[in-house]
């Protein structure tokens, strides 16, 4: 017999992963998007935060993709634990704001849009028990106005009822 339900525990242990070792110039993006003709490129905030060099690699990739007319999607996916060692939220915001003008499809929840781009949903309670849909619409309108290059902006809405129930 135990005591209660253990909360979820996530570990972003990507230290020394092959992707974290990538540096600008390691991938021939002109070959990927030009010669090979990749039509869609997806990346995101987790990859950008893996090391000091991966954010530069993402920037290099999205610029090359746009040169060839490749659709670029990006999941903000802010993870404080990954950004902590390379400059924290301030660095995350600077990096994501630099990348955003090259993105066609931007994905993220309200916390991602706040942490990574500085947009906030007004009207939600701190525990997200009751969502203000007008606040979400207003934030998305602000995002679309700031980044007219976004062809699609996607988010999720979740009301937290309890530790085990979400709507």
Please provide the spans of the model-predicted regions.
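Conserved N-terminal subdomain of the carbohydrate kinase-like
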Residues: 1-45, 69
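Flexible, glycine/proline-enriched loop segments at strand-loop-helix junctions
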Residues: 9, 13-17, 21, 43-53, ...
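Acidic/polar active-site rim loop that often engages polyanionic ligands
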Residues: 39-46, 118-124
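Short, conserved structural micro-motifs that define repeat-unit consensus positions
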Residues: 66-72
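Conserved phosphate/ATP/ADP-binding segment of small-molecule kinases
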Residues: 68, 79-167
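Acidic/charged, solvent-exposed loop-and-adjacent secondary-structure segments enriched in E/D, K/R, S/T
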Residues: 75
């Amino acid at each position: 017999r135990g005591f209660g339900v253990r909360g979820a525990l996530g570990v972003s242990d990507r230290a020394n992963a092959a992707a974290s070792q990538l540096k600008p110039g390691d991938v021939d993006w002109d070959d990927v998007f030009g010669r090979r003709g990749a039509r869609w490129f997806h990346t995101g905030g987790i990859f950008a935060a893996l090391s000091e060099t991966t954010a530069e690699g993402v920037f290099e990739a999205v610029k090359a993709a746009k040169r060839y007319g490749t659709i670029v999607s990006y999941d903000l996916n802010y993870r404080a634990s990954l950004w902590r060692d390379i400059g924290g939220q301030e660095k995350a915001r600077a990096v994501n704001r630099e990348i955003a003008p090259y993105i066609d499809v931007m994905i993220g929840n309200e916390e991602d849009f706040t942490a990574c781009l500085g947009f906030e949903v007004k009207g939600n309670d701190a525990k997200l028990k009751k969502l203000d849909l007008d606040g979400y619409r207003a934030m998305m309108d602000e995002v679309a106005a700031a980044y007219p290059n976004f062809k699609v902006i996607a988010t999720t809405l979740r009301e937290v009822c309890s530790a085990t129930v979400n709507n």
